[in-house]
Amino acid sequence: MTQTTETQKTAATIEHATASEEMIEQMRSRVGVEIRRSATPQFVNQWNADAIRNYAIGTGDPNPIHYDEEYAAQTPFGTRIAPPNCLFSLGVGTLMATTFGMPGLHALYMGTEFWFERPIKLDDEIQSTLTYGPITTQDGASRFAGTRIVQTMDGEFVNQNGEHVAKSRDHVLRFDRHGGGRSKYKDLERAVYDDADLAAIDADIEKEVRRGSEPRYWEDVEVGEEIPWIVKGPLTVTDCIGFKVAWGFFPFCRPNRIGFEYRQAHPRAYTPNPYGVPDIPERVHWEDALAETIGIPAAFDYGPQRVSWFGHLLLNWVGDHGWIEYQNVQLREPILIGDTSWLQGKVERKWQEDGKNLVSLNLWAKDQRDRTTTTGSAHVSLPSRAES
């Protein structure tokens, strides 16, 4: 069959869409307005044992506090807790790609800030309220392609008891889909490994340290101290699929009849695949050719996947007696399929405030090329020897 349908024509045409002042002003008028959830509901409402386990598996985090109820019952939480960045399954990092009214502009997630107030415990029911945040623009070519528009989305999360669990702010870059020729990444070489390379990576993976049940006391932490790394990779499409299973189908992964109905309602959300079939823009995470059209030389990781890796790093370091108060992870470079990432951190400051023993951490990730692909920061609270 070679007949071109109207939907295919629309999908092909939209690849050339560009940002307009009308689009930008329309989005600015929505700042502070709650985002409609009808087309993109929460993937998880109740964090039962399956949901907690699946998110931990999806991020490659083996911490028993997410899996083992007998172990978790002995911690200060008294039960299993969900990985902190599981809030992505409630719409964080998702909705702006489908509800921000800029059809034809690619949405590239840049990072999220989280303010965590309390853990999500086994069987907690969490509801999210998401609102449009501020928008900034920058004329001229971005480091990826075309006009640069940075959008934000704010989230608030409440449990079944009416208690505030967390707040978030997403950052998403919107730009013309065709601009690959301007990319600074066009000469970035793909990773190729030999047996010795893989053995060295495996050895680094095995060096991962989880504090676990042994308290890390605030008094014992020193400014300038580096926290033990964790290694993610070499990244495979399987890793991305595993995370997607945990994160949820939305915004675009809607199979068969459900996908057909969404495409009929939102044809401009699709572009034709190499076989002429309208398909979702999320293909940039497994299809090299589509990634190239936005200026990235190969398929690459999911942004929320990478942010969640840092939740794994931080929980390893603070242990069962600590808590992540604030986490800010920003993506600086793409992590291509095949890349290996070393996630690290360093103590920048320690202080006491409002009865909490606080530590500020600088965060980053480097790949096998020694590129810094990710930067960030975190504030964590730790127990004090004076309190034990």
Predicted regions and their residues:
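Hot-dog-fold acyl-thioester-processing enzymes
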Residues: 2-111, 176-321, 385-388
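HotDog/MaoC-like acyl-thioester-processing domains
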Residues: 2-33, 111, 116-223, 229, ...
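Catalytic-pocket segment enriched in acidic/His residues
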Residues: 135, 284-285, 290-292, 297-301, ...
